[in-house]
Amino acid sequence: MTNYVKKVSIEDFGCQFLHTAHWNNRLRTTGGRFFPNDRHLDFNPKIYREFGIDIFRKIVRHELCHYHLYIQGKGYQHRDKAFKELLEKVDGLRYTPRVTAVKVNYHHYSCQSCGQVYRRRRRVNLRKFACGYCHGRLIESF
């Protein structure tokens, strides 16, 4: 990953990338992140898998705009004029395309006494928890 970012940095910016770049599977709504404290970059592998190398390269350019402007002591945030100009110059993406959402599986529970229905992402220990309305016994329903 770091080698690819170094290559893009030299080809598109004419400057070296001297730090590290990593894949980060926990990223959901963003294509990448720049960390000013230690100057490393994180990238979302889902963007690469779903949209391919062309879109991913534009996201790498976007994060490298943050990186190089920070190193030069210029405005590196999205609202700064220097950032917007450099991003347009290197043909980086302003916004990340939406990744298709992963379907979340829910667990359904109902109360035996009052019939109250609960929907939860995480499983509930049926021996430990009861209905919040009538304190009746919960059962798993499908």
UniProtKB/Swiss-Prot annotation:
The keyword S-adenosyl-L-methionine does not apply. Its cofactor is Zn(2+). GO terms for biological process: response to stress. It is found in: Cytoplasm. It holds the Pfam family SprT-like. GO terms for molecular function: zinc ion binding. Binds 1 zinc ion. The active site is at E63. Zn(2+) binds at H62, H66. GO terms for cellular component: cytoplasm. Keywords: Cytoplasm, Metal-binding, Zinc. Its main location: cytoplasm. Residues 4-138 form the SprT-like domain. Belongs to the SprT family. This is Protein SprT-like. It comes from Streptococcus agalactiae serotype V (strain ATCC BAA-611 / 2603 V/R). The lineage of its organism: Bacteria, Bacillati, Bacillota, Bacilli, Lactobacillales.
